[in-house]
Swiss-Prot record:
Keywords: Acyltransferase, Lipid A biosynthesis, Lipid biosynthesis, Lipid metabolism, Repeat, Transferase. Pfam families: Hexapep, LpxD. The active site is at residue 231. The lineage of its organism: Bacteria, Pseudomonadati, Pseudomonadota, Gammaproteobacteria, Candidatus Pseudothioglobaceae. InterPro entries: Hexapep (IPR001451), LpxD (IPR007691), Trimer_LpxA-like_sf (IPR011004), UDP_GlcNAc_AcTrfase_non-rep (IPR020573). SUPFAM superfamilies: Trimeric LpxA-like enzymes (SSF51161). The keyword Repeat applies. This is UDP-3-O-acylglucosamine N-acyltransferase. Gene3D superfamilies: Hexapeptide repeat proteins (2.160.10.10), MurE/MurF, N-terminal domain (3.40.1390.10).
Length: 332
């Protein structure tokens, strides 16, 4: 918990409001309450600012007149937000063995495991050697955690989940802000990973925690080996993801989707329910209709690639036009 005055000093902001108000955490502009901080970066989000219930908003000067609450005024909003996240990041200190506050029901726990503060492990779980379970993790019943798995602070695992060797759940997402000198400043990720029941996660898969809200893997999802799931992703119930798939940040995958091996889904993409993506495809736009999708082209200079894409997208029209012209020529 920090006062607005302390936060303003940390992020080098001009404070407009009460310096003694205490802030307990960070939330999105839509969900923040009177004890939380949020940020608004750009005029297109002005209406969100006007409707905000946050205790304080990080913003730039041209939005100050629209702010209904306390404000932290800066030039680089995203950089200031990045600095603020580190104030609210919980730090985990690894103990040896099992912390005395952990609540472990009937479970088999192998040697060399680390189990942190306030961990809850359900009935009939099996924890293999060299597993790290950090503070505040909750694990349901009948879950199998195989060797060398790391489940990091605050994450939640449902019932009857299988987690294969080398999996990392709750690692920091890839989020950074740049300063004026183009130096990078990391964003501390404050969300968690929430995994439902009857989920299978293949070896060496990584699932990043959310930036502010949680990364979510719903019930029945099947994930193969070496899959990367970035921060803020939501994967719907009973979807299946084959090996080496990469899912970019803030994607939403619907229910019962099937993603073929080696496919890449770009950040901020949404797939509706019952989508099939062919292996090695690149998904760079929202898929709003059920169906089977395929797409991959060779790499080129970006400007050339964009021209090629325009031609490819219009090949049917071009072919139709050429057929008409060919018939006209034959008729002469």
């Amino acid at each position: 918990m920090y006062t607005l005055g302390e936060i303003a000093k940390t992020i080098n902001a001009k404070l407009v409001g009460d310096a003694n108000i205490e802030i307990t955490g960070i939330a999105t502009s839509l969900s923040a309450n009177q004890t939380q901080l949020t940020y608004i970066n750009g005029n297109k989000y002005k209406q969100m600012l006007i409707n905000s219930k946050a205790g304080v908003v990080i913003l730039n000067n041209n939005l100050l007149k629209n702010c209904p609450t306390n404000a932290l005024v800066v030039d680089n909003v995203y950089l200031a937000f990045a600095k603020a996240t580190h104030l609210f990041k919980k730090q985990t200190v690894h103990c040896q063995g099992t912390h005395s506050s952990a609540k472990i029901n009937y479970a088999k726990i192998a040697p060399n495991c680390i189990i942190g503060k306030n961990v809850v492990i359900g009935n009939h779980c099996t924890i293999a050697p060299n597993v790290v379970i950090e503070d505040d993790v909750i694990i349901g019943n009948y879950t199998l955690i195989q060797p060398n798995v790391s489940i990091l602070q605050g994450c939640s695992i449902g019932n009857n989940v299988v987690i294969s060797p080398g999996v990392v759940i709750g690692s920091e997402g890839f989020g950074n802000a740049q300063d004026q000198q183009k130096h990078w400043y990391s964003i501390a990720h404050l969300g968690y990973v929430i995994i439902g029941s009857n989920v299978s996660i293949g070896a060496n898969t990584t699932i990043d925690r959310g930036t502010i809200e949680d990364t979510q893997i719903h019930n029945g999802v099947q994930i193969d080996n070496l899959v990367h799931i970035a921060h803020n992703v939501i994967i719907g119930q009973d979807s299946a993801i084959a090996a080496t798939v990469t899912i970019g940040g803030s994607c939403t995958i619907g229910k019962r989707c099937m993603i073929g091996g080696g496919a890449t889904i770009a950040s901020h993409i949404s797939l509706v329910d019952d989508i099939i993506v062919t292996g090695a495809s690149t998904v760079d736009k929202n898929l709003s209709e059920q169906g089977h999708y395929t797409g991959f082209t060779s790499i080129n200079k970006h400007q050339k690639w964009k021209k090629i894409q325009v031609w490819l997208l219009n090949l049917d029209k071009i072919a139709h036009y050429l057929n008409i012209k060919l018939k006209e020529l034959k008729g002469k």
